[in-house]
Curated annotation (Swiss-Prot):
<protein>
    <recommendedName>
        <fullName>Uncharacterized protein MJ1509</fullName>
    </recommendedName>
</protein>
<dbReference type="Pfam" id="PF09123">
    <property type="entry name" value="DUF1931"/>
</dbReference>
<dbReference type="GO" id="GO:0046982">
    <property type="term" value="F:protein heterodimerization activity"/>
</dbReference>
<dbReference type="InterPro" id="IPR009072">
    <property type="entry name" value="Histone-fold"/>
</dbReference>
<dbReference type="InterPro" id="IPR015207">
    <property type="entry name" value="DUF1931"/>
</dbReference>
Length: 153
C-alpha cells in the first residue's frame, strides 16, 4: 500500500465520524488518489489566480474554496483535534505534491492539513449524499464521487 496522507486507522475513524460510512484499506488508497488529484487541481487554480494578480506568493484568497468546502473544513478541524492527527506529517507530504513555481504563504502552509483532510471528508460526503443507505465505501462509489468533484472542485 502506498504512503497514506492520513494514517489508515485515523482516516477510517474520521470517515465513520463525519460521513457515517466504513472505509477499508483498498478503498482508502483509491480515495487518496482522488484527494491528491483534487489538491493539485485546487493549487493549479490558486497558482493561476496568483499569477493573474502578479502576486509573488500564493495566499489563501487564491485557493478556490467554496462555502460548502469551508463548512466541511470546520468539521475536519474539530475531528483533527480529537484524532490527534499530526499536521506536520501532512504538511510535508502535501508540499511535495503541490504543482507550480510560486511559494506558499505561511498561512496557506499552516492550512494544508485542513485543506487536505477536508477533501477526504468531501469525497465521503458526496458518496453519502449519492448513496444515503450505504455502510461501506466501495470502488464504484469513489469513481462516482470523483466525477462529481471533477465538475465542482
Amino acid at each position: 500500500m502506498a504512503e497514506m496522507i492520513i494514517p489508515y486507522p485515523q482516516l477510517k475513524k474520521i470517515m465513520k465520524t463525519t460521513c457515517e460510512i466504513d472505509l477499508y484499506k483498498t478503498e482508502a488508497e483509491d480515495i487518496m488518489d482522488v484527494v491528491e488529484k483534487k489538491l493539485a487541481d485546487l493549487f493549479e487554480v490558486a497558482h493561476r489566480n496568483a499569477k493573474e494578480e502578479n502576486a509573488k506568493i500564493i495566499k489563501m484568497r487564491h485557493i478556490p474554496l467554496t462555502k460548502g468546502f469551508l463548512n466541511s473544513m470546520e468539521l475536519f478541524r474539530s475531528v483533527i483535534e480529537e484524532e490527534n492527527i499530526v499536521a506536520e506529517t501532512i504538511k510535508k507530504y502535501v508540499m511535495k505534491k503541490i504543482p507550480g513555481d510560486l511559494p506558499l504563504d505561511d498561512i496557506v502552509v499552516d492550512n494544508l492539513p485542513l485543506i487536505t483532510g477536508t477533501i477526504f471528508i468531501v469525497v465521503g460526503r458526496v458518496i453519502k449524499a449519492l448513496h444515503e443507505d450505504i455502510e461501506r465505501i466501495r470502488k464504484e462509489h469513489i469513481e462516482e464521487a470523483k466525477k462529481v468533484l471533477d465538475y465542482t472542485l
